[in-house]
Amino acid sequence: MRSPGEVLREGELEKRSDSLLQVWKKKRGVLTTDRLRLFPTGPGARPKELRFHSILKVDCVERTGKYVYFTIVTTDRKEIDFRCAGESYWNASITLALIDFQNRRAMQDFRSRRERAAAAAAAAAAAAAAEQEPEAGPGGQP
């Protein structure tokens, strides 16, 4: 099992800007078990993070001769366009890391629900057992 924040992959990918011209900007991507960090090429700039809990899916994969284009769709339905070199398969790496994250979260949710259900069942059984005990009368006799 991987530790949270473990780096799975580093390398170059490009993000399409939100500006009117929609130019492609090179970023250094760092993929971990719970997020994708995008570092600008300039020194001292802060990275942007896409945490997996806010990513819905990786979509719209298209291959051209040189690039693979893909879109990350967030839980608020925002679409962020990326491209990477055809042989780098960043889209597959991000998709697999996202699926792994979602599976881990689903297992945690399942365990939490099961523990809550077991605690509720134990409390109900204890309450039922308490109701079944005869009340003691004077002198400790029922």
UniProtKB/Swiss-Prot annotation:
Protein name from the UniProt record: Pleckstrin homology-like domain family A member 2
Domain comment as written in the entry: The PH domain binds phosphoinositides with a broad specificity. It may compete with the PH domain of some other proteins, thereby interfering with their binding to phosphatidylinositol 4,5-bisphosphate (PIP2) and phosphatidylinositol 3,4,5-trisphosphate (PIP3).
Residues modified to Phosphoserine: 3
SUPFAM superfamilies named in the record: PH domain-like
An annotated GO BP: positive regulation of apoptotic process
Classification via SMART domains: PH
Top-rank taxon: Eukaryota
Domain (PH) ranges: 7-99
Keyword annotations: Cytoplasm, Membrane, Phosphoprotein
PANTHER family: PLECKSTRIN HOMOLOGY-LIKE DOMAIN FAMILY A MEMBER 2, PLECKSTRIN HOMOLOGY-LIKE DOMAIN, PQ-RICH PROTEIN
Keyword check for Nucleus: no
Family: Belongs to the PHLDA2 family.
Matching InterPro entries: PH-like_dom_sf, PH_domain, PHLA1/2/3
